[in-house]
Amino acid sequence: MAARFLTLDEVAEELAVTKTQVYAMVRDGELPAIKIGKKGHWRVERAKLEEYIEAKYAE
């Protein structure tokens, strides 16, 4: 079973973009993400990533 949450590195790999580009999408509110832990590691829920991809196809 696939993990529910993805790191920004994993999202970047899925989208074939850089981690910096993914961080910019998160920072700008384009891609929903949550911060985990004291250090604030970003995580993207797999379902939200799938919704993001589907929305991009619909544009």
Task: Please describe what each predicted stretch is.
Residues 9, 29, 46-47:
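Structural detector for helix-capping/boundary residues
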